[in-house]
Every structure is written in C-alpha cells, then in structure tokens.
C-alpha cells in the first residue's frame, strides 16, 4: 500500500507515475474523499473545543449555584453530532482504504517507462546458446519418453497439470535440492517450511488481494460451517514475507533472508490459449523462493544481490540466460523495480522467464505493518524483496532442451550429478543400460 501522506502531498505526481505503469488513478474520487475527511475532522475539532469550553462553563455555573440544564443540553447535542461524525469518518476512511488497496506501487525512478514486455530493457547476457548438429526437440518430445506424462496429469486434474515419473521426477527433485543447498550454504538464506494454505489477510499483506482474487485457488474446510475462505499460495513469497507481519524487528536482526521450496498454485485466469503445450504454464508448479527483509537504505543493494543469487543457479547449471529490467507497464502490482532472468530455450529459439526479482520497498510492509526499530529507537517500515531462485519446472524444461542428445537421452548437468547418485545422463527406461 502506498503512503497516504505521499498522495496528500503530491497527488498529481503520484498519478503521473502510476499512469506510466498503466494505472489510471481516480484523482477526483481521492480528492473528494480527502476533502470530506478534512471537513469532518475540522468540524469534530471545533465541536471538541466547544464541548471543552462548555464543560468548564458548567463547572463554574455549578460553583455559583446556577441552572446548567440548557448548557448541558447543548453538550449532549454536541456529543450526538460527534458520534454521527465518527461513524461518517469511519465510512470515509474505509472507502479511502479500499481505494488505496487497489493502487499498485509507484515505480522507482530508474525503471524504464514502457507499455508492456516489448519495451523491457535487456541488461546483460551470460553464456552462448549451444549449437546443435541435429534437429532440436522441445521439452515435451524430449521428456515424454523419460517420464514426462501430460496425459495422466490431465486425467487426474485437467489441463495444465503434469505427472513426472522415474528419472524426470528424480531430476526435478535434484534441481530443487540443488537450489536450496546453494541458497542456504552459499548465499546466506535460512531454509523455511511454511503452510501452503493461507488466510485472506496474508494475501492482502503481499498484494494478491483484493485485486487478483481470480488468479488464486480458494479452499474450504470440509464439514465446517461459516468458515473463512482460505487460499492456496501462488508463491511462497506470500507466506515467507508475512512471517514478519505485525512485528517490530530489532535493527541488529536485519537483513532477514529466507528461502523455501514449495508448490505454487495459479488459476492462470488471464492466460487462456497461452503456452498450452508442455510445462511452461501450469496450474501447479514448484519454485524455490528467496525473500529478504531489509532496512530501507539497503534494499536496492539487496535487489542486485538477489538477482546475482538467481544468476548463480543458472551459471552453475551452465544454462545461457539474459537479465532484463522490466518497464513500468510490465511490472507486478507490488513491485517498485523488477529484474527478470530469462533462460534460453533452443526449441523456441528464444529466452523465457525463469526468475523474477523485485524490490517492493515499503509497499508490502505497510500492508503487513512490518517494522524495525531504527537508530533513533522509533519503529520504521522495513523494505521487502522477493525473487525466484528458481522456478523448478521451467528449469527442468531448460535442462531437457539444452542438454538433449541426438539419441534421445539427456546429459545431467555436472552440478546436479551429486544429487542424482552420480548419474551422468538419463535415458528412456526401454533403452537404459
């Protein structure tokens, strides 16, 4: 959530910056609510002052033995008006809160202005795409003989679900373990296991609600009546970041660096017809997430660090990739600045997103009331960052395509072999040695 004081001080400036990311701020609605709020608060202050004056007058009159009934009646009327004003003020504050919850974060000044992904800016590339001397297959054709089973996934759960078997399942598990070990042993993150089902207020905290309810899977407790609807997490960013909600952290405890491996559940409501083949866009997929909770002055250095941590995974796997700075029109709702990592997929002859690393500044912290005690001993909002480290399914796709061989086998990246019992390549069961 944005700082309402920022809007009060520079409403037109905020509106312009939000317009850069495609959000039309309703300046008239905000201004009208603010004017009404100020009028009620001013009137309430006047009434309070009048009531205080009358209370003193009543005391003096009683001391002189005078009749105070008329003055007391006026005080009673003032009390009634103040109660009505308080109710009206609560209504206005609620409407302001609703308006604020719909507003995305303000882009950082360094974010390139653009309408959509076509105007993102490439920052750098790493690695050269492999030159194949045979016809390249996509991950579906490579993986199906090795245990990638879309037919059974569809039979069990419908479209955009997959069953992994045998060597493919083992490779998928190896990737997740390798990512976790790298982040915990080399990058300083603390491995964390959190619930996959969360309450609505948790999703308000990280910005998925109220705007993106249609992208979530809702769950209800069987056999229970009048229960609160809960949600399956779309990323473990949600649960990891909310571990610091409603808390004041000592400055000495910062930065807090957390990582988790979890399934992620997304309805993909706005993705009809996109990436319908294979594992690129699934309703359920695994991801290793990185989250950092930091002091405000450290957040952009932390963003660069986090991007480097995601890059390290791709470099160890020797997968070519590029880093892209997202433009204003392509950033996520809560982000002030985002870098995407895109991995090379030879069958598509292009780079595809495999990680997104974002600094939300104080946007999520304000919603969560996550604070730290600053040098002056006063509570101050932390900055929160999140990044994929990496999406496990898409990394599996990249390994299958980049490490495929002409005979249908797949070479196991050197970094993964300790997690595969020393296996150097995987073959279809029918042709395995």
UniProtKB/Swiss-Prot annotation:
Pfam families the UniProt entry points to: Seryl_tRNA_N, tRNA-synt_2b
Keyword hit for Ligase: yes
GO biological process: selenocysteine biosynthetic process; seryl-tRNA aminoacylation
Keywords assigned by UniProt, alphabetized: Aminoacyl-tRNA synthetase, ATP-binding, Cytoplasm, Ligase, Nucleotide-binding, Protein biosynthesis
Top-level EC class as recorded in UniProt: ligase
InterPro entries: aa-tRNA-synt_IIb (IPR002314), aa-tRNA-synth_II (IPR006195), aa-tRNA-synth_II/BPL/LPL (IPR045864), Ser-tRNA-ligase_type_1 (IPR002317), Ser-tRNA-synth_1_N (IPR015866), SerRS_1_N_sf (IPR042103), SerRS_core (IPR033729), tRNA-bd_arm (IPR010978)
Pathway field: Aminoacyl-tRNA biosynthesis; selenocysteinyl-tRNA(Sec) biosynthesis; L-seryl-tRNA(Sec) from L-serine and tRNA(Sec): step 1/1
Family the UniProt entry places it in: Belongs to the class-II aminoacyl-tRNA synthetase family. Type-1 seryl-tRNA synthetase subfamily.
PANTHER family: SERINE--TRNA LIGASE (PTHR43697:SF1), SERYL-TRNA SYNTHETASE (PTHR43697)
Protein name, as recorded: Serine--tRNA ligase
């Amino acid at each position: 959530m944005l700082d309402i004081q920022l809007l009060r001080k520079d409403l037109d400036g905020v509106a312009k910056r939000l317009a850069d990311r495609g959000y039309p701020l309703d300046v008239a609605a905000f201004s009208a609510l603010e004017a009404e709020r100020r009028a009620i608060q001013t009137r309430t202050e006047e009434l309070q002052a009048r009531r205080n004056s009358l209370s003193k007058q009543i005391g003096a009159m009683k001391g002189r033995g005078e009749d105070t009934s008329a003055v007391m009646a006026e005080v009673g009327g003032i009390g009634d008006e103040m109660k009505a004003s308080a109710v009206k003020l609560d209504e206005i504050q609620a409407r302001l809160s609703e308006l604020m919850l719909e507003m995305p974060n303000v882009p950082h000044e360094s974010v390139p202005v653009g309408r959509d992904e076509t105007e993102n800016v490439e920052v750098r590339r790493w690695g050269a795409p492999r030159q194949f001397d045979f016809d390249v297959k996509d991950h579906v054709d490579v993986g199906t003989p090795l245990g990638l089973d879309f037919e059974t996934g569809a039979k069990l759960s419908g479209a955009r679900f997959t069953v992994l078997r045998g060597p493919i399942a083992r490779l998928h598990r190896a990737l997740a373990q390798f990512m976790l070990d790298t982040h915990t042993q080399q990058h300083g993150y603390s491995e964390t296991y959190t619930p996959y089902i969360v309450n609505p207020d948790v999703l308000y905290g990280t910005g998925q609600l109220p705007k993106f309810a249609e992208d979530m899977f809702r769950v209800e407790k069987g056999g229970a009546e009048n229960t609160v609807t809960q949600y399956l997490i779309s990323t473990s960013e949600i649960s990891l970041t909310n571990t610091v909600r409603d808390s004041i952290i000592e400055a000495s405890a910062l930065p807090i660096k957390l990582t988790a491996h979890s399934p992620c559940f997304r309805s993909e409501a706005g993705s009809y017809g996109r990436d319908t083949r294979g594992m690129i866009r699934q309703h359920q997929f695994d991801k290793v997430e990185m989250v950092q909770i930091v002091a405000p002055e450290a957040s952009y250095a932390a963003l660069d660090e986090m991007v480097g941590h995601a890059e390290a995974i791709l470099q160890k796997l020797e997968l070519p990739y590029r880093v892209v700075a997202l433009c204003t029109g392509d950033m996520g709702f809560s982000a002030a600045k985002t870098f995407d990592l895109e991995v090379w997929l030879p069958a598509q002859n292009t780079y595809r997103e495999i990680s997104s690393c974002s600094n939300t500044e104080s946007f999520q912290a304000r919603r969560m009331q996550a604070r730290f005690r600053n040098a002056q001993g006063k509570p101050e909002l932390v900055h929160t960052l999140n990044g994929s480290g990496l999406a496990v399914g898409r990394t599996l796709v990249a390994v299958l395509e980049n490490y495929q061989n002409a005979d249908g086998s797949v070479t196991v990246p050197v970094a993964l072999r300790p997690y595969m019992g020393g296996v150097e390549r995987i073959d279809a069961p029918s042709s395995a040695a």
